[in-house]
């Protein structure tokens, strides 16, 4: 009988005990031990095996249940190495902040107290050995009677009492260290969160004589904001680093082996199109979450729906500019996007457009196609799965859910422009907030139209702000089959509703006067519809011919 698939299980011991299919990543333990740095931060996208690897480190190093844990590494790579002598040698603290998210700072304070109380409850056995003062401190943390200010020292306190119990330094593992910081950024209380976590992390990780090693995981490296500015003993390994490149994610060889095991090796090229394409250092890797889902359900679709990542995409769309639209368009047309990537994110202010792309890269929504020099890279969409997620997010922002978009696009491609105008007007009135359409926000309308373009991407190529004739047109939908009809659109906004029709006619005249159809005709397209589109708030008028 074939092994089961441990979908959603990120506890290493459970995966092994339940005899689930496991790709041996225990070489990571050997690399961690050989790595001389005291504190290591691994930045990888969500669902790339960070928690499973942390859980593996916990079971490997933990002095508690040493013999029992030794068994779970039987026949794995690490068992046959010199590094295996480190198994079961240290007390371990494993704190996951994955679910530490809150809408307000007050709620976050409560969540922090609960998370630390839960952590301490795993070490209640230490109470037997503590003096009165330490017992009081421990019990107050357990009962959530401690001021938040005092909790900044909680992890260091725990390392001390563990050291005193075992006379061994402590391994500290903090999973998803940045989850509460991203939540604070999205919900507007970042400075308060930063002040707490900066001290919370540095007290345990810096100048701590009870610390053997610290390992943190997250998506981003929040360093400009000063979270780790005090840590001079920190080594950071991001997706741009040349070490630990295959510790997270699956290599092609590992994916082929898994497909073969389940008798579906013929799917490799489809699987590659959908889930491959990530570049970590010099290794090309697949998204492990999606591969596990595919092995389970044997269906090619987007499995990697990640709410916090989608919040970031929505953030990009919220602050959308004409430049963002054009960049997204290039990405959707399969082109690369040149960007300066510093590898750090400053969440203390609204992200600049450049930093948004960086965040998208570290979150797994873009990947590196080519390194130009030290900080400059060409980025692209990694695969079909991510492309599908962008499209879905785009469509929901502009068109809501349901079949509105389908009917709208049918009207356009069948050249029923009056019906197209009516349907677009309805979408503007029902799906779009006033802020999006306020005066002069042409970028929003570009986004709206681009969403339509994405919908047509199988049969059409969409382009915006490209030189043709005597100027630059706003938007063109060009058919791949040159016998079909093309559409040239020019947008103008006005704050005078009575001038709506007049402005739409001006836009139409501009298309003709500036000969925007030249490049289409050169490409062999004969049938072209010219559309001048005028907006005033949520009102629209299209003049066409």
Roles of regions detected by a PLM:
Residues 420-545:
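Structural signature of nuclease core domains in nucleic-acid processing machines
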């Amino acid at each position: 009988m074939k092994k089961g698939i441990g979908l959603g299980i990120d506890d290493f011991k459970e995966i092994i005990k339940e005899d689930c299919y496991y790709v041996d990543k225990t070489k990571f333990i050997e690399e961690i031990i050989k790595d001389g740095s005291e504190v290591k931060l691994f930045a990888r996208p969500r669902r790339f095996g960070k928690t499973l690897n942390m859980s593996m480190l916990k079971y490997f190093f933990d002095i508690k249940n040493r013999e029992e844990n030794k068994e779970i590494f039987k026949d794995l790579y690490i068992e046959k190495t010199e590094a295996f002598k480190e198994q079961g040698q240290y007390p371990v603290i494993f704190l996951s902040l994955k679910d530490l998210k809150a809408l307000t700072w007050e709620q976050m304070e409560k969540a922090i107290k609960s998370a630390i109380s839960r952590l301490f409850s795993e070490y209640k056995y230490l109470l037997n050995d503590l003096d009165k003062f330490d017992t009081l401190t421990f019990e107050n943390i357990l009962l959530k009677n401690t001021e938040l200010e005092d909790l900044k020292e909680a992890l260091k306190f725990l390392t001390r009492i563990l050291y005193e119990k075992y006379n061994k330094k402590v391994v500290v593992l903090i999973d998803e260290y940045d989850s509460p910081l991203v939540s604070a950024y999205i919900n507007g209380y970042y400075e308060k969160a930063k002040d707490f976590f900066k001290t919370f992390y540095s007290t345990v990780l810096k100048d701590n004589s009870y610390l053997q090693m610290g390992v943190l995981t997250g998506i981003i490296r929040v360093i400009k904001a000063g979270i780790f500015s005090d840590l001079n003993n920190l080594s950071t390994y991001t997706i741009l680093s040349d070490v630990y490149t295959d510790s997270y994610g699956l290599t092609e060889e590992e994916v082929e082996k898994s497909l073969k095991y389940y008798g579906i090796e013929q799917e490799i090229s489809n699987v590659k199109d959908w889930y491959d394409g990530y570049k970590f250092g010099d290794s090309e890797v697949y998204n492990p979450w999606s591969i596990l889902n595919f092995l389970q359900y044997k269906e090619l679709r987007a499995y990697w729906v990640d709410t916090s990542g989608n919040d970031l995409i929505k953030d990009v769309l919220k602050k959308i500019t004409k430049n963002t639209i054009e960049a997204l368009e290039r990405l959707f047309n399969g082109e690369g996007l040149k960007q300066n990537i510093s590898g750090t994110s400053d969440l203390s202010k609204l992200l600049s457009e450049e930093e948004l792309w960086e965040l998208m890269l570290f979150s797994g929504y873009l990947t590196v196609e080519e390194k130009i020099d030290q900080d400059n890279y060409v980025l692209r969409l990694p695969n079909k799965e991510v492309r599908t997620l962008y499209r879905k997010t785009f469509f929901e922002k502009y068109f809501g859910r349901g079949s509105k978009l389908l009917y709208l696009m049918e009207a356009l491609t069948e050249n029923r422009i009056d019906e197209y105008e009516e349907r677009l007007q309805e979408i503007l009135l029902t799906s779009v907030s006033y802020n999006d359409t306020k005066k002069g926000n042409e970028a929003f309308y570009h986004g709206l139209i681009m969403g339509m373009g994405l919908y047509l991407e199988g049969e059409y190529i969409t382009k915006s702000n490209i030189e043709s004739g005597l100027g630059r047109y706003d938007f063109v939908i060009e058919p791949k089959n040159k016998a079909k009809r093309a559409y040239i659109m020019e947008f103008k906004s006005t704050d005078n509703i009575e001038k709506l029709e007049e402005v739409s006619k001006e836009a139409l005249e501009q298309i003709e006067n500036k000969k925007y159809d030249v490049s289409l005709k050169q490409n062999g397209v004969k049938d072209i519809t010219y559309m001048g589109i005028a907006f005033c708030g949520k009102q629209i008028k299209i003049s066409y011919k």
